Amino acid sequence: MNLIEYEAYFWAKFFVAERAVSGVIIILIYLIIASVLAYILSFHIAKIYLDEKTVFSKITGRIISFFERMIGESPDHGMTFKEYFINLLLFNFFAGLISFLVIMFQKYLPFSYDTVGMSPSLDFNTVVSFLTNTNLQHYSNPMRLSYFSQTFVITGLMFLSAGTGFAASMAFVRGIRTDTGNIGNFYHDFLVSIFDLILPLTVILTVILILAGIPETMQRYITVNAFLTNKVYNIPLGPVATLEAIKNIGTNGGGFYGANAAYPFENPDWFTNLVEFVSFVIIPLASLISLGIVFGDRKFGRMLYWVVMFFFIFDALFAFFGEFAGVPFLHLGYYTGNMVGKETAIGISQSTIFAVGATITSTGASNAALVSYTPAGIIGVLIGLLLNDPLGGVGTGVLNIFMYIIFTVFIASLMVGKLPEIMSLRISSKEIKYSTLSLITHPLLVVIPLGITLMIPHLMSSFVNPESSRITELLYEFASAASNNGSEMGGFITNQPFFNYLDGVLMLLGRYLLMAFQLIIAQSFSVKKAKAQYYRSIDTSNWIFGVLLIAAMILIGLLSYFPIIVLGPLLSWAHDFNLILEAMV
C-alpha cells in the first residue's frame, strides 16, 4: 500500500468512525429528550392514577359527568373484575361491530370518492387490528378506506383502544393501592383516560404536525404533472395530521399511507421524526415513572425507568451498529452503512432508534423498510417484540411490567427464604399462577402459529427471501400480532385470508386474554390489607432487584424463542459472516 492509498484508507476509516459516534450521540439525544418530557408528564399521570383532580379537571370534569349521566354510570359505582372486564369487552365488541359494518358499506357513505374497498377477511383483520391497539395493516393503498372510514373508524378506534388500555392500568393500580374489594368503574376510567390525558396531548401534537407541514384536509388528492415522464399522477391527501397525532400519542402505529412514517406526508424531516418518536414514548415511559409517586417510593419508579432504558439502549445500539456495519461481502454500506429502504433525510441512527422505540413500546410505526434491514439490525428491533414490548402501550406497559415484577419477586423470595410481597401486599399462589399464565401466553401465541404456517406449502410459496429469512419474517409477523404491536416486516403477501384471520385471532387473544389475567390479579390484590408502610420481604426498588428483573425478562422473554432466533436471524447473520470468511480465504 503506497502513501496515497494509505492516506485514503485512513480518512475513510476516520469518517466512518465519526459517523458512528455522531449516530450514537443522536440516539442518546432522542432518549434524553423523551425521558425529560416523560418525567414532567409523570406527575400528571400520577394524579390520574390516584383519582385526584388534574389541570384539565375544571373543563373535563363537566364533560365526563355529562357522559356518565347519559349512560347511567357513576365513579362511585365500583366494579369487581367480572363486571369491569365484561363491560370492557362489550364496549369494545360493539365498537368493533359498528366499525366492521361501516367499512363494509363505506362506498354508500359520505366522502367515499374512488375508494377500492376491502374483502371481508381484510375488513375483519383491519377492525380487530385497530380495536386492539395493534394497527397491523395488511393493506398499503390509502384508497382502500374512504375519508369517512379513516376519520370515524380508524381514528375513532385509535382513541378507543388507547383509552381502554389506560383504563385497565388505572384499575390494576387501584387494585394494588386500595383494599375496597373493587377495581373501579370502567366507563369512568375510560372517560378520564380520554379527556384528561389522551385528547389534550393529541390536540397539541396535531397543531405541531400541521405547522410542520403535514396535510390536514378533506380534499381527496392533488393532481401532479411529472416534468420528466410527462405523466399525470394523483397523490392522495386527507386528514393526515389528526390521524398521525393519535397514532403516536395512543401508541397505535397505523399510518394513513402504506409506507407509514417513511412517507413524506406523514414524516417529512428530522424534526417531525423526533416529535413523533417522543410522542409515542412519552405516555408509556411517564406511566412507569409515575408509579414511584403513586406508591410513595420514588426509587421504585427510577428502578423501572433504568430497567426499561437498559433494553432501550441495548436494542438501539445493537440495531444501529448492525445497520451501520452493513454487509461488507456484498459491498453493502461499507462506508455509508446500510441505507437500503431508509430515507436519506433521516439516516441510519434516526431510523433505528425510531424502529426500536416502536417495538419497545407497542406502537409499531416505521420510518424505514424493515425487510431491508441486515440480520443484526433486525435482531435489535425484534428483541422488543419477543419481550412483549417492555415499555408497552398506553396503560398496557404498566400491566406487562408488573407481570414480570410479580414473577421476579416470587423467585427472589424463594432464593433468600422469605415470603413474597410487593407494595406491602402478600403475593399468593393465585397471583403467581395468573402472572405465569400471562408470561407464557405470548410465546405460545407466537410459536404455535409459526410452526403450523411452516408446514403449509402454498403459503410458503408467497415468500421471496431464503429459508432463514422466511422464519424471521414469520416470527416477526406473529410476534407483532400477539404483542399488539403492529410493526410489519413484510417479505411475503400478508393480505391472504389465512393471515388475515389468523393474525386477527392472535391480536384478540394477545389483548383480551392477557388483560383478563392481569385484572384478575388486580381484583385479588384489592381485597388484601397492606402491612406497615415501607415493610417488604425484599427491597423492590434497589439496583439488585432491577438486575434480577432484567434477568427474568431475558430468561422468560427471550429464551422461549431461542431455537427460532437461531434458525432465523442468527442463521442469516452467521451466513453473512461465513461468506466474509470465505472471501477472506
Curated annotation (Swiss-Prot):
GO terms for cellular component: plasma membrane. It comes from the Archaea. Disulfide bonds: none annotated. The chain crosses the membrane at residues 23-43, 85-105, 152-172, 194-214, 275-295, 307-327, 345-365, 367-387, 397-417, 444-464, 502-522, 547-567. Keywords: Cell membrane, Ion transport, Membrane, Potassium, Potassium transport, Transmembrane, Transmembrane helix, Transport. It is a multi-pass membrane protein. It is found in: Cell membrane. Its main location: membrane. GO terms for molecular function: P-type potassium transmembrane transporter activity; potassium ion binding. The system is composed of three essential subunits: KdpA, KdpB and KdpC. Part of the high-affinity ATP-driven potassium transport (or Kdp) system, which catalyzes the hydrolysis of ATP coupled with the electrogenic transport of potassium into the cytoplasm. This subunit binds the extracellular potassium ions and delivers the ions to the membrane domain of KdpB through an intramembrane tunnel. NCBIfam families: kdpA. Belongs to the KdpA family. This is Potassium-transporting ATPase potassium-binding subunit. The gene is kdpA.
